[in-house]
């Protein structure tokens, strides 16, 4: 018996696959913004499968970056006022009762008496200097040990013809004496003995309660016949005075000039038996000073017409 073989074709199947991406959650910054991606399209069975993740056809809006807060402008720097001098009194602080001290500056003409007082009271060297006629003075207030002190520097003429008519008023109620000489002028140093005798004649002796100091000015000037420091120190020791050498012209010596007068002011502040001028006395001295300067001006004009 013969066998019959029947070939049965294999069954064919059609498979349709649908790939769905998982949902993605995106936070929206505005109500009208999209929060999810659109659904992907089904893939054709004959199309090759892409192993890379599906990219949504519709773009998804992302939140806008938040701008940093604006940086506030830097505060404007406060412009500082003019530099105050050392130990200048403050207007917001209360001090003890103010005292006024009268300090006279004596010495030959052109030794720098006016320049020294200008440097201490005004903090600079005068641009133009002229010979002093009669008497002039400058003031400055300083705070020493919480006490407000006012110092008056009386500058007198070095010429003999002007000095004779003012000595009676010039040496009255004096609290301290400053002798000045020019280190480049030996004559001004030799005449210091005459100035000391004149002070002693009016009661300002070396062993009194009125302090005295000696200042050698113009130490910045080169000179062959210069008064040596040793010679000046010996003279100061014999007359019970402290010696200082400085220059009123040099800006680098400004602190030195400052310390000289502040040292004297410290000594005045610590000394107890001392006459301190009242307001009425200061007003009277101011009137006398104006009268003296007017009289000296008239005398100069009269001398100009002499034959």
Swiss-Prot record:
PROSITE patterns in alphabetical order: RAB
GO biological process entries: Rab protein signal transduction
Main localisation: membrane
Amino-acid positions noted as binding GTP in the UniProt annotation, renumbered to this chain: 107-114, 155-159, 217-220
Skewed-composition ranges (Pro residues): 42-56, 65-75
A GO CC term attached to the entry: plasma membrane
Cysteine disulfide partners in this protein: none
Motif extent (Effector region): 129-137
Alphabetized UniProt keyword annotations: Cell membrane, GTP-binding, Lipoprotein, Membrane, Nucleotide-binding, Prenylation
Positions of the UniProt region annotated as Disordered: 19-80
Membrane topology category: Lipid-anchor
Domain of life: Eukaryota
Compartments it resides in: Cell membrane
Family: Belongs to the small GTPase superfamily. Rab family.
Protein name in the entry: Ras-related protein Rab-33
Organism: Caenorhabditis elegans
UniProt gene name: rab-33
């Amino acid at each position: 018996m013969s066998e019959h073989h029947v070939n049965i074709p294999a069954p064919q199947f059609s498979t349709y696959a649908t790939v769905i991406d998982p949902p993605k959650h995106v936070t929206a910054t505005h109500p009208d913004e999209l929060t999810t991606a659109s659904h992907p399209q089904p893939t054709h069975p004959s199309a090759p499968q892409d192993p890379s993740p599906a990219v949504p056809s519709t773009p998804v809006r992302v939140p806008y970056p938040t701008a940093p807060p604006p940086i506030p402008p830097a505060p404007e720097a406060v412009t500082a006022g003019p530099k105050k001098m050392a130990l200048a009194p403050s207007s917001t602080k209360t001090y003890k009762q103010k005292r006024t001290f009268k300090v006279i500056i004596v010495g030959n003409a052109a030794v720098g008496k006016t320049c020294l007082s200008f440097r201490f009271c005004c903090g600079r060297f005068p641009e133009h200097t002229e010979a002093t006629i009669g008497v002039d003075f400058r003031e400055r207030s300083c705070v020493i040990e919480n006490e407000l002190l006012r110092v008056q520097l009386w500058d007198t003429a070095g010429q003999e013809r002007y000095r004779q008519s003012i000595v009676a008023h010039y040496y009255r109620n004096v609290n301290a004496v400053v002798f000045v000489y020019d280190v480049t002028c030996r004559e001004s140093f030799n005449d210091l003995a005459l100035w000391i005798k004149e002070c002693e004649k009016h009661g300002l002796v070396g062993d009194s309660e009125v302090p005295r100091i000696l200042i050698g000015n113009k130490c910045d000037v080169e000179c062959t016949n210069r008064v040596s420091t040793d010679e000046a120190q010996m003279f100061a020791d014999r007359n019970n005075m402290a010696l200082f050498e400085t220059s009123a012209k040099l800006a680098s010596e400004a602190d030195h000039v400052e310390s000289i007068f502040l040292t004297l002011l410290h000594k005045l502040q610590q000394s107890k038996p001392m006459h301190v001028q009242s307001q009425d006395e200061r007003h009277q001295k101011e009137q006398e000073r104006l009268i003296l300067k007017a009289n000296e001006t008239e005398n100069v004009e009269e001398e100009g017409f002499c034959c």
